[in-house]
């Protein structure tokens, strides 16, 4: 059960970050570069998972994306896609709770980029897409990586939304936190609980240290760029 929970946790965390990254980059760019009506409201909605109880998030996902949910039922009828009580639902839960952290890190990185660089490229005839992929995205890459690391760490620790939305099924939805929950309720399973706890602490600490290193690297690069200007 331990190895299965560890492998599933890593798979869920990586998958949730890869699937949510394109949307996170787009949303971060939209919030950093555009002014539009309702921007504050959208920002608040995006950051709701940071303040809502995870159980509430899980319930909302169940209502919306469950097999009988107002979105999930059409996904199941038309494409045979079901999120409830499957590892895909665990990926979705992790992606939702980690999404604000990824967006915030990328947005801060974008806001620190000198917009004059983008304007100069456009003046020289570069298209908006070319400016984004050759200037904006490369310069924001440290922030993107930092956001991914933070989101990965948050996904590893997700419990409430996952157990509410997809239950606690060994080998299918039972990630490290859910496996620890099961072990805690099992007499004589203290050793297994301690091993999973230690693994989670080490992995989370490595993720946070990596995120901090990437943030400092980003600040150093931006500082060098300002000196060069």
Curated annotation (Swiss-Prot):
Belongs to the binding-protein-dependent transport system permease family. CysTW subfamily. Residues 6-214 form the ABC transmembrane type-1 domain. This is Molybdenum transport system permease protein ModB. The chain crosses the membrane at residues 12-32, 45-65, 83-103, 132-152, 196-216. One of its GO terms (molecular function) is molybdate ion transmembrane transporter activity. Part of the binding-protein-dependent transport system for molybdenum; probably responsible for the translocation of the substrate across the membrane. GO terms for cellular component: plasma membrane. The gene is modB. Its main location: membrane.
């Amino acid at each position: 059960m331990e190895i299965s929970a560890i492998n599933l946790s890593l798979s869920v965390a990586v998958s949730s970050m890869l699937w949510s990254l394109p949307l996170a980059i787009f949303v971060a760019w939209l919030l950093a570069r555009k002014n539009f009506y309702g921007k504050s409201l959208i920002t608040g909605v995006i950051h709701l998972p940071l303040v809502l109880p995870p159980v509430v998030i899980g319930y909302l996902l169940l209502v919306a994306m469950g097999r009988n949910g107002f979105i999930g039922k059409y996904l199941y009828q038309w494409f045979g896609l079901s999120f409830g009580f499957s590892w895909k639902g665990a990926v979705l839960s992790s992606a939702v709770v980690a999404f604000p952290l990824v967006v915030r890190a990328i947005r801060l990185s974008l806001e620190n980029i000198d917009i004059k660089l983008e304007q100069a490229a456009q003046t020289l005839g570069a298209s908006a897409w070319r400016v984004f992929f050759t200037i904006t995205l490369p310069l924001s890459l440290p922030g993107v990586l930092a956001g991914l690391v933070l989101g990965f760490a948050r996904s590893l620790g997700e419990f409430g939304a996952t157990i509410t939305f997809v239950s606690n099924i060994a080998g299918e939805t039972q990630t490290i936190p859910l496996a620890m929950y099961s072990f805690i309720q099992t007499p004589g399973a203290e050793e297994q609980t301690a091993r999973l706890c230690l693994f989670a602490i080490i992995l989370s600490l490595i993720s946070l240290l990596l995120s901090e290193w990437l943030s400092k690297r980003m600040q150093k690069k931006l500082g060098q760029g300002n000196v060069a200007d």
